[in-house]
């Protein structure tokens, strides 16, 4: 039975962690490599870096961060943000990323997913889907793809797009509810379930985690294969080890071996 994965996520801008992290003993809370080391020691199954730097000039900084993180950490690393070409994917993989997440570029050109998957293998390619519910109350649920941090509507149905990019060769889908993101009110379980039911590739639930029960629900109710969270880990509400124990107690298959530091940050 495949184990459910817990994936902390770090937003990186201009080479620094945005929204910071609070870890005891961390020399530099703004250094993504230092934060990654903590999550690696804590037993995170994977780590996700999302680069929200606007300028292309800063890509060299991101590649350096990926390289230093890959050297220092054992856990798999997914990197996304600003990926526009097959060459961008190649550069990140060469720097040490295990997977590359494609967002806006996949919406503009779904065949980019096919080209990247053909060249590097589907297991390396994640498509990040940012969606908002657009159906009126009482109507069948429907979600639209938004790009550029949830600002720009596309008119594209999220579930249909998920099917398309899975067929194009995406090995995994990172599904974020823009309605729920930052609310700490739990994942949009209907969105997660609709997409996980529509595709055969793994789905990562993202956006809205407020507590450990939300992680359980993402899998048990949303059908996700992995759960992504940020604030509950960054700010010390729970450790990765506590999250794994809670999910295992709920009957989910978790990887409990290996490093499992229960240390967490002061609130």
UniProtKB/Swiss-Prot annotation:
Enzyme class: lyase
Gene Ontology annotations of biological process type: L-histidine biosynthetic process
Stretches assigned to coiled coil: none
Localisation per UniProt entry: Cytoplasm
EC number(s) on file: 4.3.2.10
Assigned keywords, A-Z: Amino-acid biosynthesis, Cytoplasm, Histidine biosynthesis, Lyase
Pathway named in the protein's UniProt entry: Amino-acid biosynthesis; L-histidine biosynthesis; L-histidine from 5-phospho-alpha-D-ribose 1-diphosphate: step 5/9
Gene3D superfamilies: Aldolase class I
Pfam families assigned to the protein according to its UniProt record, in alphabetical order: His_biosynth
CDD domains membership: HisF
SUPFAM superfamilies: Ribulose-phoshate binding barrel
Active site per database record: 11, 130
GO-annotated cellular components: cytoplasm
Job of this protein: IGPS catalyzes the conversion of PRFAR and glutamine to IGP, AICAR and glutamate. The HisF subunit catalyzes the cyclization activity that produces IGP and AICAR from PRFAR using the ammonia provided by the HisH subunit.
NCBIfam families: hisF
Subunit structure: Heterodimer of HisH and HisF.
Name of the protein: Imidazole glycerol phosphate synthase subunit HisF
Gene: hisF
